[in-house]
Amino acid sequence: MTKQPNAKRHTALLGGTFDPPHFGHIRPLLDVLKHWPLQDCWLLPNHIPPHKPGTHASPKARLEMIDALCREFPAFSLCDVELRRDEPSYTVNTLRQLRELYPDRVFYFVMGMDSFLSLDKWFEWQQLFELCHLVVCARPGYQLAADHGMAEVLANRQHTEADLPAEDSGKVLIADIREQDISSTDIRTALAERRDIRQLVPESVARVIETQGLYR
């Protein structure tokens, strides 16, 4: 059995609009949970995403979709700290709040390679390494070139062991996972065109979308 490096709980975090949540979110997280001995995963829906113009479904509808998803997949839990804000959801502020609320946890913020490549444009991005570890998942069409600015960050911080880091923050873990070429935009387009989406979203999410007539 892979040992835990300390007595704290190790929790994966995935933020996003989840508009709607889909297998492109879920399958990489399930792979991450299989690869490392993380004990749970929290989904963090944004209220006001800082890098997007807004959302299509209401906060209430997105909350219901995520709540249904978490009932279908018990490894996931809803964390609504960002959804309750009336200001842009900057990741660094969320992590500061979570570290204060849950000092007994070590957080692993999960992102795609596309997000990691632009991490140096995030608000106070360097402070993230004081607050959490990063788990970077492959995304179709995105590779980290040797001369990219984030290559040095990865070289200095990459954790390559099978066990979790002994530190509470500061490492980058590269997840060798199944790439998922699924986007919320594609799903909304399919719904608007009355096409079937059940290969793209969990059954629980599809039921909420159908019951509420979302994205029509």
From Swiss-Prot:
Pathway: Cofactor biosynthesis; NAD(+) biosynthesis; deamido-NAD(+) from nicotinate D-ribonucleotide: step 1/1. Catalyzes the reversible adenylation of nicotinate mononucleotide (NaMN) to nicotinic acid adenine dinucleotide (NaAD). Keywords: ATP-binding, NAD, Nucleotide-binding, Nucleotidyltransferase, Pyridine nucleotide biosynthesis, Transferase. It catalyses: nicotinate beta-D-ribonucleotide + ATP + H(+) = deamido-NAD(+) + diphosphate. Pfam families: CTP_transf_like. InterPro entries: Cyt_trans-like (IPR004821), NadD/NMNAT (IPR005248), Rossmann-like_a/b/a_fold (IPR014729). Its EC number is 2.7.7.18. Transmembrane segments: none annotated. Belongs to the NadD family. This is Probable nicotinate-nucleotide adenylyltransferase. Signal peptide: none annotated. GO terms for biological process: NAD biosynthetic process. The gene is nadD. The keyword RNA-binding does not apply. GO terms for molecular function: ATP binding; nicotinate-nucleotide adenylyltransferase activity. It is an enzyme of class 2 (transferase).
